[in-house]
Amino acid sequence: MKFFGILLIVTMVVLVMIATTYVESISIGIKCSPSIDLCEGQCRIRKYFTGYCSGDTCHCSG
């Protein structure tokens, strides 16, 4: 049973690594304050799936 648990964990880690390889994330140089709405809107204009804040800088991914 212990072997299958380790195998499951390794498989999950590999899948996460593969998934994050295909998700492009870039900083677009926009400040997130006063709200994240501007960040999300600018990311969608640039054809990215979503926008998120890291610190006070907007990043786009997808």
From Swiss-Prot:
Compartments where found: Secreted
Signal sequence extent: 1-25
Organs and tissues of expression: Expressed by the venom gland.
An MF annotation (GO) of this entry: toxin activity
Keywords recorded for this protein, A-Z: Disulfide bond, Neurotoxin, Secreted, Signal, Toxin
Membrane-crossing segments per the record: none
Keyword Signal: yes
GO cellular component, one term: extracellular region
Domain of life, per lineage: Eukaryota
Disulfide topology: 32-53, 39-58, 43-60
Protein's name according to its UniProt entry: Venom protein 51.1
Organism: Lychas mucronatus
